[in-house]
Design a protein with these regions (language model features):
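Extended, well-folded interaction surfaces typified by the phenylalanyl-tRNA synthetase beta subunit core
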Residues: 2, 7-9, 13, 17, ...
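Broad gene-expression machinery/nucleic-acid interaction feature
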Residues: 3, 63-67, 116-120
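Internal, well-folded beta-alpha domain core
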Residues: 77-154
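Short, well-structured beta-strand/strand-turn elements
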Residues: 33-40, 98
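Short, charge-patterned binding micro-sites
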Residues: 38-72
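Short beta-strand-to-loop capping motifs
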Residues: 8, 68-74, 121-125
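Short, solvent-exposed beta-strand/turn "edge" segments of beta-rich domains on protein surfaces
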Residues: 16, 58-59, 110-112
């Protein structure tokens, strides 16, 4: 088994696809590209793929991660660069693999690896208004977020 971590972009119209839709895109693209994946055991075997943090629908990203468990038992060697080329040829517009690494030994999951995210947000207001919002929030001791979930405020 060869553990491969891919880094990709998600830009353009594909940003409106949900996390689950993107997962289906990856599974289909891996199947079309004939990448030999490891599968789970049981009644409904699934490819062993791990996804990074779910990106909100509508957001673009330069740095999305996915871990693959590639079955290398029937091949003498697998070239990860060939995997990237094959996947990039079959991925939909807006998704592009821009990095790959082979994970050796025991390594932390994607969820454990991500310690921070950087967000670039465009606000359609003038700079002085946005600056006053930021100053007001930065001067608060605590920030309370209220939202409604299942008809109740949480």
């Amino acid at each position: 088994m060869l553990a491969v971590r891919l880094r990709s972009t998600k830009k353009g119209k594909i940003r409106f696809a949900s996390h689950r839709d993107i997962a289906k895109v990856w599974e289909r693209t891996l199947r079309i590209s004939n990448i030999p994946l490891m599968y789970s055991q049981g009644f409904s075997p699934r490819p062993k793929i791990s996804y990074g943090l779910a990106l909100p629908t509508g957001a673009e990203s330069d740095c999305e991660y996915i871990d693959l468990q590639v079955d290398d038992s029937n091949r003498e060697s697998i070239n990860v660069e060939e995997i990237c080329t094959s996947l990039n040829d079959n991925l939909p517009p807006g998704i592009l693999i821009n990095g790959v690494s082979v994970m050796n030994g025991k390594f932390p999951s994607l969820q454990q690896t991500v310690t921070s995210c950087i967000w670039d947000i465009t606000v359609n207001e003038d700079d002085t208004k946005v600056d006053s919002w930021v100053d007001r929030i930065n001067n608060e001791n605590t920030i309370v977020l209220r939202r409604e979930r299942k008809g109740k405020e949480v």
